[in-house]
UniProtKB/Swiss-Prot annotation:
This is Elongation factor Ts. Associates with the EF-Tu.GDP complex and induces the exchange of GDP to GTP. It remains bound to the aminoacyl-tRNA.EF-Tu.GTP complex up to the GTP hydrolysis stage on the ribosome. Belongs to the EF-Ts family. One of its GO terms (molecular function) is translation elongation factor activity.
Length: 296
């Protein structure tokens, strides 16, 4: 049977799979549309296995909050390219995961990945189906549940790549959201100096001492230099020490104090942070794509 362009188009519309994958499935099933769909679903797991080694550095973050605003889940799902992240298939998958996370409130990614969907499929099976549809490796990278009984929760998303959740004691939702926005922009490592390790502070101080002594300035002046640099270092990496992005004349520490509030915790997710992207030259990249098309 001749595999027409209209058959390939129909199969693509029904499966969201690539053109060559659709044509191959129709060829193997002699143009039987339903058999081709079954074949593509069956081969999905095998394709997912082959794609599993590919680096996923693009993606989306998703935040879901309960009706009573006492529970929030935040998750990151990755793909290989930003092209896939803009597609309805991937966006729908991430939306489904966000709903599932809020429903199950997992304590870690391992617990989340062990969940079963309403249709009886495992989450891994659902992931493999998405991989078969979009033709890229998909990774459900991380998830976190944040709960509070009496605190105030604030959330902020910068586009689809950065998401922040803050929990305040005192204050209100406007303040909580403002602080979440600040965290998105300024990336503090912790709330206050009390959370910094002694090892980190001593290591930084040793560096500053060495630099100051190399300046050959008087000892009393060197001490002032070290104190000043340590204070600047601490302020730059702690939330309370940072200057508020909406009002550079005040620090976050002073802001929460003036509102009779405290920051109890925060979570910041940024797509791809900590993932090393493999460097490839253009020729290697083209060859890899050709080889990938041949094996898929």
């Amino acid at each position: 049977m001749t595999i027409t362009a209209s058959l390939v188009k129909e199969l693509r519309q029904r499966t969201s799979a690539g053109m060559m994958d659709c044509k191959q499935a129709l060829t193997e099933t002699n143009g039987d549309m339903e058999a081709a769909i079954d074949l593509m679903r069956t081969s999905g797991a095998a394709k997912a296995t082959r794609k599993a080694g590919r680096i996923t550095i693009e993606g989306l973050v998703k935040v879901n909050i309960s009706a009573d605003k006492k529970t929030v889940t935040i998750l990151e799902v990755n793909s290989e390219t930003d092209f896939v992240t803009k597609g309805d298939v991937f966006i729908g998958f991430v939306d489904m995961l966000g709903t599932l996370a809020l429903k199950t409130t997992p304590i870690n990614i391992e617990e989340f990945l062990s969940q079963t969907l309403d249709n009886g499929d495992s989450l891994e099976k659902a992931r493999e189906d998405i991989i078969a549809k979009v033709g890229e490796n998909i990774a459900i990278r991380r998830v976190q549940t944040i709960t509070t009984n009496n605190g105030v929760i604030g959330t902020y998303k910068h586009g689809e790549r950065i998401a922040v959740v803050t929990v305040l004691e005192g204050g209100d939702e406007v303040l909580a959201k403002d602080i979440a926005m600040h965290i998105a922009a300024s990336k503090p490592e912790c709330i206050s100096e009390a959370e910094l390790s002694t090892d980190l502070l001593e290591r930084e101080k040793a560096i500053f001492v060495k630099q100051a002594k190399e300046s050959e300035k008087p000892d009393n002046f060197i001490e002032k230099i070290i104190v000043g640099r340590m204070k600047k270092f601490v302020n730059e990496i702690t939330l309370y020490g940072q200057y508020f992005v909406k009002d550079p004349d005040t620090t976050i520490g002073k802001l929460v104090q003036s509102n009779n509030a405290q920051v109890k915790s925060f979570v910041r997710f940024e797509v791809g942070e900590g993932i090393e992207k493999k460097e490839e030259n253009f020729a290697d990249e083209v060859m890899a794509q050709i080889q990938g098309a041949n094996t898929d």
